[in-house]
């Protein structure tokens, strides 16, 4: 994709928001010119960012800020920074880098080590989650199991997604319902009452999966 875009002079912009909590991102390996992330997806503050591989791009793109005296990234920012949130952003990354207490070295080194272990743990737990949902009555998983991040959306024909999410919340399970999605709309998901979306966090356990399935079973 990167080579095809660059051959015609286009930029490759990768929205890595959904992958960031689960995969170690490398803008060079991806071949992306711009990488988009949002810290709230890994438990950080409500801060989104565009990471540019080449700082010279700042001068090539049309500015958003009307102040034409600005240079660099300030050309694409409006208003003051939320410094408390930026401090929380750093803290959230340090938290991920410290999940494995044996990790040493720079922040990037520790993050690589911790994310490697986290990925293996969550892939095993994801396998358990998918199998548990597949065996639950009235649950239809959306999408394929291969190459999936630990986020799962499903429908329950005859049960509105909002009702299912409310039952999960009442049982201590956090879930989203009816997330706006053209993909879901194209699949006709709204016709089945909408989709429920759940995701695994570093602290998720098999017990959480069991609690999820028990709560869904109570809707049958």
Model-derived regions, located:
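Pyridoxal 5′-phosphate
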Residues: 1-220
